[in-house]
């Protein structure tokens, strides 16, 4: 059986490919600025590279995804935990001209593009150095492939969409807040092989170390310690960032930790549709989260919560075990990379 050929034409402000962006004369603030990697694109890419059914091509190189690449973990979003610097093997790299020729020959079953690469907003700020090539590739793809063969991931924090592409691609929107027959809701996903199981008896403390927005609690620079902290904690704090979906929500679940999500009831029904929002609301209502927490603005529309506390004695151990079991079951049934890829492909029929 022949493999499914997929071209990823997605790019970011890679420090390896575009070092001129960084430093005192670059458009990024400083040399220690992290790359703006997209979690959704990277999670799907990682899964397809690990599944023998797919033959994955790249234009440009997804350099930050490969274990033996020159990318440095400290330069990547979230130190590269879970997704980046973890793919083995040789990349199938194509030049822009080669990619265009193969697209014109219709060699690919699917072409993946994303808003991080296509959206002029990034280019206008000097953070999309592949943009001119992207325009050429996108024009070729649109002229050669039907919408069901073009997978477009809009992982922007804003609720707006690129209207000119709707109907011309299979459009997936992360922060979706309006119903449209040609736009599909989507959220982040997590590699199933990274799931860490834990029983209630293995928990050693009530609350995980990280408090979102409090940089003094961002202590972890290695993946194992970070996830073990969640795995051995009964609860983990999380809430909306600039957009509703946030990889931290998933890190908590896939570490067998119960998320305390104070603003979950404000999330739009079409946003985070795969996430267990009802269970998160149940956690707020069961009595374990104490009254007195409050929201404060950090800047623009980014906010945090203060004084979020739990009292484990307010619920029974049996209820906690049942709740944790339901959350883990939901995560493995709906939020793995495999399940998200199946969902994506189901929308191309």
Where are these regions (language model features)?
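Nucleotide-sugar donor-binding catalytic core of glycosyltransferases
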Residues: 2-321, 325-347
């Amino acid at each position: 059986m022949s493999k499914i050929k997929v071209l990823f034409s997605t790019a970011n402000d890679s420090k390896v490919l575009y070092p001129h962006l960084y430093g005192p004369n670059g458009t990024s603030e400083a040399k220690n600025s992290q790359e703006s990697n997209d979690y959704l694109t990277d999670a799907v890419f990682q899964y397809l590279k690990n599944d023998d059914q797919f033959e994955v091509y790249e234009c440009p190189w997804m350099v930050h995804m490969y274990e033996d690449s020159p990318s440095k973990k400290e330069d990547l979003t979230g130190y590269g935990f879970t997704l980046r610097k973890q793919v083995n093997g040789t990349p199938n790299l194509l030049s822009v001209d080669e990619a265009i020729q193969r697209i014109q020959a219709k060699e690919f079953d699917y072409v993946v593009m994303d808003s991080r690469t296509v959206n002029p907003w990034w280019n206008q700020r000097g953070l999309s150095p592949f943009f001119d090539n992207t325009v050429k590739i996108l024009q070729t793809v649109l002229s050669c492939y039907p919408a069901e063969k073009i997978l477009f991931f809009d992982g922007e924090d804003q609720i707006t969409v690129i209207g000119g592409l709707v109907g011309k691609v299979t459009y997936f929107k992360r922060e979706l807040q309006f119903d449209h027959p040609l736009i599909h809701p989507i959220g982040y996903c997590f590699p199933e092989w990274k799931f860490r199981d834990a029983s209630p008896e293995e928990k050693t403390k009530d609350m995980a170390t990280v408090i979102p927005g409090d940089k003094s609690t961002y202590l972890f620079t290695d993946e194992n310690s970070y996830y073990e902290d969640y795995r051995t904690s009964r609860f983990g704090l999380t809430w909306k960032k600039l957009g509703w979906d946030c990889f931290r929500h998933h890190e908590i679940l896939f570490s067998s930790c119960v998320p305390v999500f104070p603003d979950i009831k404000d999330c739009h029904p079409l946003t985070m549709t795969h996430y267990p929002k009802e269970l998160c609301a149940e956690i707020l209502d069961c009595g374990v989260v104490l009254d007195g927490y409050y929201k404060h603005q950090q800047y623009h529309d980014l906010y945090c919560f203060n004084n979020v506390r739990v009292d484990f004695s307010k619920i029974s151990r049996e209820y906690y075990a049942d709740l944790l079991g339901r959350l883990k079951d939901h995560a493995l049934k709906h939020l793995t990379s495999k399940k998200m890829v199946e969902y994506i492909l189901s929308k191309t029929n």
